[in-house]
């Protein structure tokens, strides 16, 4: 069975994303995702990173990451090849992982680097590009990974239906019945 884990990267409700929220997010996924499943994620901070964490903990047997940009294994960051301040998938990923890393007091991109260096983890990345188009290409790759019998977990700040977002973009592309929405408000202590 494959388990796709997607959702908030930390763009909203930053004040509620704490070192106490994170364990609740991971615990909820451990409860819902069968042990030994293959995890799939887009490599973003917070919700997507739950798949990396479950793999690190041995809960997932394999992991497939569809990253929005190349990753520098030495400096543990996403790279885009542009000099200066350019809005890109890499700069966005680094920004949100930077905030996430501060909360957890560890480099979460390093978690990804360590995961992709193991035999049980595969990954793809989008080529460097200005703008955020690579995020949507990555979303499509994540969505294509699943078929009936698999599952999707989406962690968002919505209650009920998902609002317009990158998570909803991926959610809408996935055509299986086992799709579960986890409200982040339920993860906050």
Report the location of each language-model feature:
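Acidic/glycine-enriched connector segments
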Residues: 2-187
């Amino acid at each position: 069975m494959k388990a796709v884990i997607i959702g908030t990267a930390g763009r909203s409700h930053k004040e509620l994303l704490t070192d106490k929220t994170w364990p609740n997010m991971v615990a909820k996924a451990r409860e819902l995702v069968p042990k030994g499943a293959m995890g799939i994620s887009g490599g973003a901070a917070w919700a997507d990173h739950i798949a990396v964490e479950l793999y690190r903990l041995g809960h997932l047997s394999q992991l497939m990451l569809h990253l929005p940009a190349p990753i520098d294994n030495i400096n543990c960051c996403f790279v885009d090849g542009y000099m200066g301040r350019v809005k890109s998938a890499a700069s966005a990923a680094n920004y949100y992982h930077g905030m996430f890393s501060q909360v957890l007091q560890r480099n979460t991109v390093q978690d990804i680097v360590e995961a992709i260096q193991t035999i049980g983890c595969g990954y793809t990345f989008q080529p460097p590009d200005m703008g955020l188009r690579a995020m949507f290409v990555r979303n499509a790759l994540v969505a294509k990974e699943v078929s009936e019998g698999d599952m999707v977990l989406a962690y968002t700040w919505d209650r009920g239906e998902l609002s317009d977002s990158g998570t909803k973009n991926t959610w809408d592309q996935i055509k299986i019945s086992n799709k579960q929405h986890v409200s982040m408000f339920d993860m906050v202590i």
